[in-house]
Regions:
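Structural microfeature recognizing short secondary-structure transition sites
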Residues: 52-58
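Ser/Thr/Gly-rich low-complexity blocks that favor extended beta-strand/coil architectures
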Residues: 15-31, 103-110
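Single conserved hydrophobic/aromatic residue that forms the stacking wall/gate
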Residues: 1-12
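A generic "binding-loop/recognition-motif" signal
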Residues: 10, 28, 38
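Short catalytic-site patches enriched in acidic/histidine residues
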Residues: 13, 35
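Membrane-interface junctions of multi-pass transporters
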Residues: 47-51
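C-terminal effector modules of nucleic-acid-centric enzymes and ribosome-associated factors
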Residues: 38, 43, 58-210
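Conserved hydrophobic positions within beta-strands
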Residues: 10, 20, 32, 114-116, ...
Length: 210
């Protein structure tokens, strides 16, 4: 039997014994055989708890650090996402448009290129809207927090929050409509985000017809 035990912090959907799930971004299909937290067996994992899950259908060498167990298919990994990016006041240098940085979110990490959407530079202590283009798809969702480090020397220079994990395209820089959209999306709950995306899709369809 192919099985493997994985650990991590539960964030959203609640795994239940026997659930079918997917390990992302690898795409491996698995079944939850057992759940534990702090040595205690569970039938349902609760959000915020550090959980160990025994998965049937995958072996150790098929799962990498930083991957996510997803129940219900609600998450899709993407190499491009929209963020609110802040540079630490004590950072030794600013972050410039097209800089490459080391990106960390929970246990996921990769190299990412920064696309600044407002100005060409974020000085220490400042923030702005940006896109991050990762070297591999990242299993992220709205509200995930992250940090960035310089590639060399490796030191933390900033961080932020994911606003849209699936923008689908690179935004035009310094576009007022894009900046307003990101501000609205950052303040909306999940239902509000869905309505905003429906409105955006309707507008794209209208533009295509015109």
């Amino acid at each position: 039997i192919r099985d493997h035990c994985v650990t991590g912090v539960q964030t959203c959907a609640l795994p239940i014994l026997g659930d079918q799930g997917t390990v992302l971004p690898s795409g491996a299909r698995v079944r939850v055989r057992s759940l534990q937290t702090h040595g205690r067996s569970l039938e349902v994992a609760q959000p915020g708890s550090r959980t160990a899950a025994n998965l049937v259908g995958v072996q150790k060498d098929e799962v990498s650090r930083g991957e996510a167990l997803v129940i219900g298919g609600w998450m899709q990994p993407s190499p491009l996402f929209d963020v609110r990016l802040r540079v630490l006041p004590e950072a030794p240098r600013p972050v410039s448009h097209a800089d490459e940085v080391h990106f960390f979110c929970t246990t996921f990490d990769c190299v990412a290129r920064v696309r600044l959407l407002e100005e060409d530079v974020i000085s220490p202590g400042e923030e702005q809207w940006a896109q991050l283009m990762c070297t591999r798809p990242a299993p992220l969702t709205h509200g995930d927090r992250f940090i960035i480090r310089a590639l060399s020397p490796s030191e933390t220079i900033g961080g932020g929050v994911v606003v849209d994990a699936h923008p689908g395209r690179r935004h035009r820089r310094r576009d007022p409509q894009v900046l307003e959209w990101l501000a609205a999306l950052s303040q909306a709950d999940r239902a509000g985000q869905a309505l905003l995306r429906l409105g955006e899709n309707d507008q794209r369809a209208a533009n295509a017809i015109v």
